Amino acid sequence: MRTPKEKNSRSRSWEDDPRPRYWWHRLPGMNFVPPVYSELTDEEWAILREWYDETDRTGVGAIGECVVPMISFLHGFMMGNRARRIVQLGTCSGYSAILIGFMLRRMNAPRGLYSLDMSAEMCAISHRWIARAGLDDFVAIVELNSTDPNGLQLAREYLGGAPELIIVDSSHEYRATLTELDLWYPALIAGGLIVLHDVSRFAADFDVTKAGGVRRAFDEWRRAHPEVETFCLNGESQTMDLPRPLYKDACGLGLIHKPGIPAGSE
């Protein structure tokens, strides 16, 4: 077993790594291990570190994780409230699916994450790592377009009820994101939360269709649904340069809260 000093040095090896994906660890004052990493067992940390090593070698196609600010938000929200029925739209190569799987296992919440991605390659990578981490009882990786209506019933059947938390980090395209919100919001349990990555002006450029990205979809959807509680962090961010606002991710974070109290059966 590692000593406390070794445990507290885990992600600090990335503080001097110049590669873009490690930007958070190079920010001023971030010379510590965030709780989402420090709470992992030695075996879990080894899995995540090996995942990083492999995806570093694989290259750009496998790199697209949400990194520390967003996963830390999800970590606190999930663990503090025992969110146990989660849908993820966009799996990429499995970073958040692995970490959410570890959280679900810690909470003893099996069949807790239903993660969709339309890329067969990304699903294969993610599924291999989920199996390697021993998370097959907690996470399902499904090759399916997140705009496919069939996903609604499939997710509900796997989770055993309506999703409590939906994470949107998929195509980054305006039209697809708007379709996702229209499709999945009605499926969300009353009192549930949708979390969207990439709602900023900076991230709008990720839309390969050049139609305004997640930011435009989120803005239009929230204007069309004034009865719904919504919030946008860093929506005006236009650069990764310093100085950064309090929420450090220039890609921004959007929140959609479905008003109401869930029925007792949920």
Description of each model-found segment:
Residues 1-167, 171-266:
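A short alpha-helical cap/connector motif
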